[in-house]
């Protein structure tokens, strides 16, 4: 499946070493002002080759809008966007075209489909997430009309945890670090892994401010279930925590409950979601990325003929996918919320009457 969402939905296409990749976004209301500079700025946050903490594959990631926008405004029809690949080096993968790279989707894709694009993983490559960020930028422009603000940052690298979450620090940080006091240590962990031909994992925090009460469709389209679904669809994500997450299973009910006052909730252990519906508090989600599987250390594997062989990788890869992955997680949050905003319009007859009553 290449489509995500119900009312506000997007479909992505393209491969890592193909001619282009892109997306089609459906369900976008007419009349939203499209800021192409903003869309490109979102792409620039995710694009590769910007510093020594990311892959050295250099892509401009310039987005071209093909449809759905007229004179700077959405028309209510499908918005299609395309991003042309510019810096593929398919020759880097010729030595592993018959091998299954440990930690990658090569083995499962080949066994499922009987064929695979070995050039950078093809469709299974994280290169696909560029299209998600483009679609997420459209979702953000919709949410901006409602003053819903989404931000993200890195709260952990290789077990080095942030104790302070400062989203202002993220803006000037090469690794989008939330805590300046541990940023250098986190950077060093990435560089040490890179210099030893290895990789490290990390954790991104996604935060939503000004989310209205009522987003989420129980029972089988709950807000938290769709957030988890969205985040787990991102390459290399192995776990998602909403609010206190795992900690909620380790404390007693009185400690975990968010008591309610006239001014709002006393605490926010639940992460802004109750019963699958947003409660008006800030939404907090932690997204856990595994260490990049593409490493330059010899590993054991098998080939497509079931022979046991050794695997030696070449190419250009992120020493820590969590850094750029945090931007993708932020985009997926925007796409989920845009969908939920539109779905919520039909929750009450009063909402429908406002549109159709004369």
UniProtKB/Swiss-Prot annotation:
An annotated Gene Ontology molecular function: FMN binding
Keyword Amino-acid biosynthesis included in the entry's annotation: yes
InterPro entries according to UniProt: Chorismate_synth (IPR000453), Chorismate_synth_AroC_sf (IPR035904), Chorismate_synthase_CS (IPR020541)
Cofactor(s) listed in the protein's UniProt record: FMNH2
Example GO BP: amino acid biosynthetic process
Cystines in this chain: none
CDD domains per the UniProt record, alphabetical: Chorismate_synthase (cd07304)
Enzyme class, first EC level, given as a word: lyase
UniProt keyword terms in alphabetical order: Amino-acid biosynthesis, Aromatic amino acid biosynthesis, FAD, Flavoprotein, FMN, Lyase, NADP
Reactions catalysed: 5-O-(1-carboxyvinyl)-3-phosphoshikimate = chorismate + phosphate
Pathway terms, separated by semicolons: Metabolic intermediate biosynthesis; chorismate biosynthesis; chorismate from D-erythrose 4-phosphate and phosphoenolpyruvate: step 7/7
Ligand binding (NADP(+)): 46
Superkingdom field: Bacteria
EC number from the UniProt entry: 4.2.3.5
Family that this chain belongs to: Belongs to the chorismate synthase family.
Protein's job: This reaction introduces a second double bond into the aromatic ring system.
PANTHER family documented for this protein: CHORISMATE SYNTHASE
Record-given protein name: Chorismate synthase
Organism of derivation: Aliarcobacter butzleri (strain RM4018) (Arcobacter butzleri)
GN (gene name): aroC
